Amino acid sequence: MEHSAWHDLIKKELPEGYFAQINHFMNEVYAQGVIYPPRDKVFNAIQTTPLDKVKVVIIGQDPYHGPNQAQGLSFSVPDQVPAPPSLQNILKELADDIGQKQSHDLTSWAKQGVLLLNASLTVPEHQANAHANGIWEPFTDAVIKVVNQKETPVVFILWGGFARKKKALITNSIHHIIESPHPSPLSAHRGFFGSKPFSQTNHFLVAQGLEPIDWLK
């Protein structure tokens, strides 16, 4: 993170001493118990998707909290791990919208410019949202603000009420917002299914003269 192009711009959006506070927090929680993702994957979203490559942002809430699932990219799991319910529904909507993606691992999206950002970057094992206590949100809000400042158009995909609250941070009119209910089984049938976010995103990117995302890769 220290050497990425993100660092200085994110730092400008944060209070003095915030990075030291985050470092102290991580030292403490990783020493106390099982935390996901592995520490070297905490900043995976911004490490995998350089700022100048960002074309799409998909905002999640916090990492998966089961063994071997979280890899620092929202909604993504390694291929050897079964897809959790929300990811199953994302892949089902993708199949209906564009075509079948075989992989559960969304790293290929991240490498194409899809920033897979969780609002909280860590979670204790089997304790969903336990770190949604304000420690991470200044950081992830700063990431969104930095992307908002880009002079090239970006698609923000906001699934569910939590992600939709981030719309207040997206003030640059060149960007495009796609919103729907969350892909969770609790809400997917209330408007996520049939929303076609993937083809919508590509139509916008192509209209702006940008390369579309190969969502099936």
Swiss-Prot record:
Subcellular locations according to the entry: Cytoplasm
GO cellular component: cytoplasm
Pfam families linked to this entry: UDG
Keyword DNA damage: yes
A GO BP annotation: base-excision repair, AP site formation via deaminated base removal
Family annotation (InterPro entries): UDG_fam1, Ura-DNA_Glyclase_AS, Uracil-DNA_glycosylase-like, Uracil-DNA_glycosylase-like_sf
Main location: cytoplasm
Reactions catalysed according to its record: Hydrolyzes single-stranded DNA or mismatched double-stranded DNA and polynucleotides, releasing free uracil
Key word Lipoprotein present: no
Molecular function terms from GO: uracil DNA N-glycosylase activity
EC category: hydrolase
Active-site residues per Swiss-Prot or TrEMBL entry: 62 (proton acceptor)
Keywords noted in UniProt: Cytoplasm, DNA damage, DNA repair, Hydrolase
Enzyme Commission number(s) from the entry: 3.2.2.27
Function summary: Excises uracil residues from the DNA which can arise as a result of misincorporation of dUMP residues by DNA polymerase or due to deamination of cytosine.
NCBIfam families tied to this protein: PRK05254.1-1 (NF003588), PRK05254.1-2 (NF003589), PRK05254.1-4 (NF003591), PRK05254.1-5 (NF003592), ung (TIGR00628)
Family from the record: Belongs to the uracil-DNA glycosylase (UDG) superfamily. UNG family.
Protein name as catalogued: Uracil-DNA glycosylase
Organism per entry: Streptococcus mutans serotype c (strain ATCC 700610 / UA159)
Gene that produces this protein: ung
